């Protein structure tokens, strides 16, 4: 289930963002978190596993005109590689339902994942 991050979930977000390979240190993680929080057209979404109730995936998205750009996709270590494709398809469908008026697209770094999810959905 996709949920939009609340202010009181910053530690969860910072923890998941720290697994992102493009954020080298805690200062970079904090800057990225602050960047998302500084504009209402940006959201951080968390995927809550329905069985464990753990937050297992973080998505950083930005609404740009009629598009939703998926800027970050971060899986927690508890998500096995073999689960990522299936989970990605479920997340893609949930994003379509949550943002029905938006075209879903990836950034330069996430486009290949978004395209794979789109082709399989």
PLM region spans:
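Conserved acetyl-CoA binding element of GNAT-fold acetyltransferases
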Residues: 66-78
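Conserved beta-hairpin
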Residues: 40-57
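Short amphipathic alpha-helix that is part of the acyltransferase structural core
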Residues: 1-28
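Conserved GNAT acetyl-CoA-binding A-motif
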Residues: 96-112, 118-119
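Short, basic/aromatic recognition patches
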Residues: 27-35
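Conserved GNAT-family N-acetyltransferase fold
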Residues: 56-59, 73
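Conserved acetyl-CoA-binding loop-helix of GNAT-fold acetyltransferases
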Residues: 80-97
């Amino acid at each position: 289930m996709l949920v939009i991050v609340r202010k009181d979930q910053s530690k969860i977000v910072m923890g998941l963002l720290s697994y992102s390979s493009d954020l080298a240190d805690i200062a970079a993680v904090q800057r990225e978190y602050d960047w998302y929080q500084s504009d209402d057209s940006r959201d951080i979404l968390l995927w809550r596993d329905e069985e464990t109730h753990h937050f297992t995936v973080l998505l950083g998205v930005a609404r740009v005109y009629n598009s939703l750009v998926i800027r970050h996709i971060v899986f927690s270590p508890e998500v096995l590689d073999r689960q990522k494709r299936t989970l990605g398809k479920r997340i893609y469908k949930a994003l379509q339902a949550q943002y029905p008026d938006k075209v879903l697209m990836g950034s330069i770094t996430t486009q290949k994942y978004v395209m794979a999810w789109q082709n399989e959905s």
